[in-house]
């Protein structure tokens, strides 16, 4: 089972507030430096990495001399605004010592619920990762409201794992993993090393709330693992203060709690595509494109499309039919119907000259395509 960790090519690492602060007295630069050293080693080993970092509110509280996390939204947002600057500067400085750059991305629930903004965020993250930059993601606490907040960065990290199609979500916390009883009260409590994310028995042992500086307890981490599992990602809940924790995970050590999805990534994603989205338009393909989809598992390129029917936006589901009108596949369009009308029948390298930009070389990528 741990081969799923050692073989994972794309990690989302989430670090909680309790780990990032020095007893509530500002950011723990020493601890951050140790994690950065390990994350740089992961990058150099070929692992694509996205960091979800808590700590903005906690850092701001320290600057303001507050010892208790405020409940008023305006005070939380003020602390986040002050602390976010220091948090990002600390990450950039630490990664910079190893010749790596970071990029700040602040998200709200609206960014991931709106399909167009979701696709734009995914495209930006993929580009940053391809460039060797480490994206540092946090919730945009300064502008978010109760109605649209993620609630905790565990949930945000799971949604980011879905967004970037990560193989592995690593949630670093102040506990060594999930136990079959509360280890703070029961010295006989045993660490749960491996389980299915959807195992209902886990709910009984995941009680409890977050600490003074954060919002997420073990129950939120379990929910995050289940959310990540929807796209086929594995989740490890593990103690962030374990020595060389990321190095040892990569080496295959049996640490923390590994929660596995029911299905593999591609199977989970394609089941979701097949059953959960309403179709908005139709693409009529030529015989060559039909053969490429059915026999070679290829993406659908504009050159293989003869006509566009219906009205759809980027990211919406379209039906792909052959010259005989029989449905071949369905998938998510990378371009709107109006844009698709302009580029069909054309080679992919002509997209930019026709539209003035190029979002993707494919009209529908094979990972977003389900054969029927």
UniProtKB/Swiss-Prot annotation:
UniProt keyword Cell division present: no
Top-level taxon of origin: Bacteria
InterPro entries found in the cross-reference section: AceGlu_kinase-like_sf, Asp/Glu/Uridylate_kinase, G5K_ProB, Glu/AcGlu_kinase, Glu_5kinase, Glu_5kinase/COase_Synthase, Glutamate_5-kinase_CS, PUA
Binding site for ATP: 14, 173-174
Residue span(s) of domain PUA: 280-358
Keywords recorded for this protein, A-Z: Amino-acid biosynthesis, ATP-binding, Cytoplasm, Kinase, Nucleotide-binding, Proline biosynthesis, Transferase
Known catalytic reactions: L-glutamate + ATP = L-glutamyl 5-phosphate + ADP
Primary residence: cytoplasm
CDD domains, sorted: AAK_G5K_ProB (cd04242), PUA_G5K (cd21157)
Pathway where it operates: Amino-acid biosynthesis; L-proline biosynthesis; L-glutamate 5-semialdehyde from L-glutamate: step 1/2
GO MF assignments: ATP binding; glutamate 5-kinase activity; RNA binding
GO cellular component: cytosol
PROSITE patterns named in the record: GLUTAMATE_5_KINASE (PS00902), PUA (PS50890)
The keyword Protein transport is assigned to this record: no
Function, as annotated: Catalyzes the transfer of a phosphate group to glutamate to form L-glutamate 5-phosphate.
HAMAP family, per database record: ProB
Family assignment from sequence similarity: Belongs to the glutamate 5-kinase family.
Protein name (Swiss-Prot/TrEMBL): Glutamate 5-kinase
Gene designation: proB
């Amino acid at each position: 089972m741990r081969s799923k960790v050692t073989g994972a090519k794309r990690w989302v690492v989430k670090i909680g507030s309790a780990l990032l602060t020095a007893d509530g007295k500002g950011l723990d630069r020493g601890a951050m430096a140790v994690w950065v050293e390990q994350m740089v080693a992961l990058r150099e080993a070929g692992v694509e990495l996205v960091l979800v970092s808590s700590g903005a509110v906690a850092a701001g509280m320290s600057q303001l001399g507050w010892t208790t996390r405020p409940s008023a939204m305006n005070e939380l947002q003020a602390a986040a605004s002050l602390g976010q600057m220091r948090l990002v500067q600390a990450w950039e400085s630490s990664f910079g010592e190893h010749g790596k750059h970071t990029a700040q991305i602040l998200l709200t629930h609206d960014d991931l619920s709106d399909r167009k903004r979701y696709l734009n965020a995914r495209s930006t993250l993929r580009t940053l990762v391809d460039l060797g930059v480490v994206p540092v993601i946090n919730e945009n606490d300064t502008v978010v409201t109760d109605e649209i907040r993620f609630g905790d960065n565990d949930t945000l990290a799971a949604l980011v794992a879905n967004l970037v199609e990560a193989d592995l979500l690593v949630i670093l916390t102040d506990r060594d993993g999930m136990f079959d009883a509360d280890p703070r009260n029961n010295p006989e409590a045993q660490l749960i090393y491996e389980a299915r994310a959807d195992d209902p028995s886990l709910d009984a042992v995941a009680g409890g709330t977050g600490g003074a500086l954060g919002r997420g307890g073990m129950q939120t981490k379990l929910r995050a693992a289940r959310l990540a599992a929807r796209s086929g990602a594995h989740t490890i809940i593990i103690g962030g203060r374990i020595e060389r924790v990321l190095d040892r995970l990569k080496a295959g050590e049996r640490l923390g709690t590994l929660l596995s999805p029911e299905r593999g990534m591609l199977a989970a994603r394609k089941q979701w595509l097949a059953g959960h989205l309403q179709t908005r338009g139709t693409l009529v393909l030529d015989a060559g494109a039909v053969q490429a989809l059915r026999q070679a598992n290829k993406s659908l390129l504009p050159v293989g499309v003869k006509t566009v029917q219906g009205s759809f936006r980027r990211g919406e589901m379209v039906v792909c039919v052959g010259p005989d009108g029989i449905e071949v596949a369905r998938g998510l369009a990378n371009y709107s119907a109006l844009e698709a009308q302009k580029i069909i029948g054309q080679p992919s390298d002509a997209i930019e000259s026709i539209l003035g930009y190029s979002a993707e070389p494919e009209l529908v990528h094979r990972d977003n395509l389900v054969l029927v």
